Amino acid sequence: MDTSHKHIALQMAAIILLGLLVSSTEIVGAQSVGVCYGMLGNNLPPASQVVQLYKSKNIRRMRLYDPNQAALQALRGSNIEVMLGVPNSDLQNIAANPSNANNWVQRNVRNFWPAVKFRYIAVGNEVSPVTGTSSLTRYLLPAMRNIRNAISSAGLQNNIKVSSSVDMTLIGNSFPPSQGSFRNDVRSFIDPIIGFVRRINSPLLVNIYPYFSYAGNPRDISLPYALFTAPNVVVQDGSLGYRNLFDAMSDAVYAALSRAGGGSIEIVVSESGWPSAGAFAATTNNAATYYKNLIQHVKRGSPRRPNKVIETYLFAMFDENNKNPELEKHFGLFSPNKQPKYPLSFGFSDRYWDISAENNATAASLISEM
């Protein structure tokens, strides 16, 4: 082979390699995104159909808020990784006695492992001293310890991480992100949890909603900043520039963790979403933009942690008509008839979900009401 042909061959090889790397990054990014499977609706499909929908749409991770037995049975052999919740209503019982935790783990984890791929046990959801769940705060850490000990007794501590899902009400200062810190009046609650999570090498699960921050302060927060569509840096924080609110919020949590002695802890975004109706700025277009951009964005990391994929769970799989207030009914990626509301992709970016059937159904419904 002469020199010119060798040069062309090397160029072609480099192009192919670059394409493979881009594809690999895209796949890894999509696979780091899961979807929360809530069940507070009276018109939702059965769990077996929901699991098939996850598989057909290439959604590889699921958050379950409680150990629904039909869902766990349907997940057998699915290869879907599961974040399984210990409901807030179970915290007092599990905190009271290690045997209660052992029974819970036996019934809901060991009976299904390894046919069901549990990734995390989320003990409690949004328990906080400054919200309506304040009465549960004293049970949370003992429940986490008992569940962790039960997981260890089952020999699964290297396979299944134990943590809790917290929300942004615990953050006192989030601007600029580098100055993120926990509220002084929650430190006695959160600091021991941070210490426990650090010792067992688990992530902290955090529910992050740019929607609520934007809707609560649209004067100072722009819609493009909340939707990942700002063309330029909006917040300059020292050497770090922020073009979207999601990054600013997640990096504020990292800064708060660092200040509380948890600098080595990873965060997993256990919920993030945007409603399509029911409140200010809750539109189908805004929700579609948010979800699409979030899926693409998390593979890039944040300014504080560039090129480090942010494991994220979209809220939620379906619109749930038994939730309140009104906007809580409209976070679904899918309508209860299993039709996607938005053209999203959990694989290659050119393979978007077909929403024509949903649009046709909506049009037919409107015509019938005329």
Curated annotation (Swiss-Prot):
Pfam families: Glyco_hydro_17 (PF00332). Pathway: Glycan metabolism; beta-D-glucan degradation. Residues 1-30 form the signal peptide. Transmembrane segments: none annotated. It catalyses: Hydrolysis of (1->4)-beta-D-glucosidic linkages in beta-D-glucans containing (1->3)- and (1->4)-bonds. GO terms for molecular function: licheninase activity. Belongs to the glycosyl hydrolase 17 family. The expression of beta-glucanase is influenced by auxins and cytokinins. This is Lichenase. The gene is GN1.
